[in-house]
């Protein structure tokens, strides 16, 4: 685990908050119970009118965007989760979902679900089932199907290929599955359990002493194989206290005998490695936060 933590050294970047206000509106329309995610703040963005003109330059941002902008963050709001898609890797940057006891029960039947392409993603940038065929990797859910038994549509949505990543079968079916089960079990102790899951592509120092970010790609669409996965659990107690549990696992076979707490890492490590920010959004609403790390109680 020391090596794992030492590897989490990528620079931090954009935050998680830009999507959550839209999520709040959609979930209110669906009469979902209020929770932490709906109260997280949207990150401030300067309005175009506030940008000073440059002498001799374009008359404003509108002129620069005359023929459109080549790419924007691809946010996807599903029945059961919100996802930010990365067209470069053919997968998600992160997926956010809310777990509650009543959502873990229902008529959702995994046998009625099939992995399928996400037609909302441009054909140039989407994964297909053919990419996984013969690759040796599982189609590993980010938002787990078992988290959303409350409706068939909610479970179906977890089978979009935009919500999966190439995952070593032993990890997917054992240690990672155990972490998903543990996440669900926390709904018995907490009022709301928010889960953010995503891939990591971590650097490794090689024989020449230099560090490189290297990862495999599969299929004709070059779907990126993460080196690691993270899972951030934001736990909201009935009294309003917020607890944070943050995990990283390598995309490799992991001995099931290793306790899950061995994979706890400081949230700062995930923020630096993923380019996401969690703590500022939480503190803006909660005011205080208890982070659980390995060895803490």
Curated annotation (Swiss-Prot):
Record: transit peptide: 1-48
Keyword Plastid belongs to the record: no
GO terms for biological process, alphabetical: apoptotic DNA fragmentation; cellular response to calcium ion; cellular response to glucose stimulus; cellular response to hypoxia; cellular response to oxidative stress; DNA damage response; DNA recombination; in utero embryonic development
Mod. after translation: GSK3-beta-mediated dual phosphorylations at Thr-128 and Ser-288 is necessary for its interaction with YWHAG and the induction of autophagy.
EC number: 3.1.30.-
Residues recorded with modification Phosphothreonine: 128
Cellular-component GO terms for this entry: mitochondrial inner membrane; mitochondrion; nucleus; perikaryon; perinuclear region of cytoplasm
Main location class: mitochondrion
Modified-residue entries (Phosphoserine), positions: 288
Entries under Gene3D superfamilies matching the protein: Extracellular Endonuclease, subunit A
Organism superkingdom: Eukaryota
Cofactor: Mg(2+)
Subcellular location: Mitochondrion
Active site feature: 141 (proton acceptor)
Binding site for Mg(2+): 172
MF (Gene Ontology): DNA endonuclease activity; magnesium ion binding; nucleic acid binding; protein homodimerization activity; RNA endonuclease activity; single-stranded DNA endodeoxyribonuclease activity
Free-text function comment from the UniProt entry: Endonuclease that preferentially catalyzes the cleavage of double-stranded 5-hydroxymethylcytosine (5hmC)-modified DNA. The 5hmC-modified nucleotide does not increase the binding affinity, but instead increases the efficiency of cutting and specifies the site of cleavage for the modified DNAs. Shows significantly higher affinity for four-stranded Holliday junction over duplex and single-stranded DNAs. Promotes conservative recombination when the DNA is 5hmC-modified.
Descriptive protein name: Endonuclease G, mitochondrial
